[in-house]
Amino acid sequence: MASSQRITLDQWKKKAAKVELNDTQKQEIKEAFDLFDIDGSGTIDLKELKIAMRALGFEPKKEEVKQLIAEIDKEGTGTICFEDFFAIMSVKMSEKDEKEEILKAFKLFDDDATGSISLNNIKRVAKELGENLTEDELQEMLDEADRDGDGEINEEEFLKMMKKTSLY
């Protein structure tokens, strides 16, 4: 995810240009911004950035907000314009949607609702899909994603594995 590495404002804007948001999402970003742009200047106070992000359903960590501010506020004005806010929130919303889709897939595997995917879960899905894989091949798939070595794939491990693929 973008929050774990340094990313420049230009990189945010390039990523945002590739994002397709629906009209409702665009409106939500605009409304969150306008809520804090009380004087209509087209900018919001950087202290309000965290609150505006929360209004859009994000729980940004203090460190993430500091990092965003360092990248956005190069001139030290203490404000962020709508264009920059929109670019950042567009990327954040697309990442959130992506995560939700991956977690839906996780739940399809985790049909016994244990919070993790076992070898038996993978066997069932492979059978349902008509995949003729040996137990060794299925075990290899599980081992590839099982980072903590507990013999099962939890949500975090599944998210990491899926983000490495070109599917998401």
Curated annotation (Swiss-Prot):
Binding residue positions for Ca(2+) 1: D37, D39, S41, T43, E48
Tissues with expression: In brain, specifically expressed in ciliated cells. In retina, expression is localized to the connecting cilium and basal body of photoreceptors (at protein level). Highly expressed in brain, kidney, lung, retina and ovary, and weakly expressed in spleen. Not detected in testis, colon, stomach, thymus, skeletal muscle, heart, intestine or liver.
Alphabetized SMART domains for the sequence: EFh
Modified positions (Phosphothreonine) in chain numbering: T134
Compartments where located: Cytoplasm, Cytoskeleton, Microtubule organizing center, Centrosome, Centriole; Cytoplasm
Residues in EF-hand domain copies: 24-59, 60-95, 97-132, 133-168
UniProt PTM comment: Phosphorylated on Thr-134 by casein kinase II (CK2) in a light-dependent manner.
Stored InterPro entries: CALM/Myosin/TropC-like (IPR050230), EF-hand-dom_pair (IPR011992), EF_Hand_1_Ca_BS (IPR018247), EF_hand_dom (IPR002048), RNA-helicase_DEAD-box_CS (IPR000629)
A GO molecular-function annotation: G-protein beta/gamma-subunit complex binding
GO CC annotation, single: cytoplasm
Pfam family membership, one: EF-hand_7
UniProt keyword annotations, A-Z: Calcium, Cytoplasm, Cytoskeleton, Metal-binding, Phosphoprotein, Repeat
Chain sites annotated for binding Ca(2+) 2: D146, D148, D150, E152, E157
Domain remarks in the Swiss-Prot or TrEMBL record: The fourth EF-hand domain has been proven to bind calcium.
Subunit annotation: Interacts with G-protein beta-gamma dimers in a calcium-dependent manner.
UniProt record similarity statement: Belongs to the centrin family.
Functional description taken from the UniProt entry: Ca(2+)-binding protein that may be involved in basal body assembly or in a subsequent step of ciliogenesis.
Protein name as catalogued: Centrin-4
Species this protein is from: Mus musculus (Mouse)
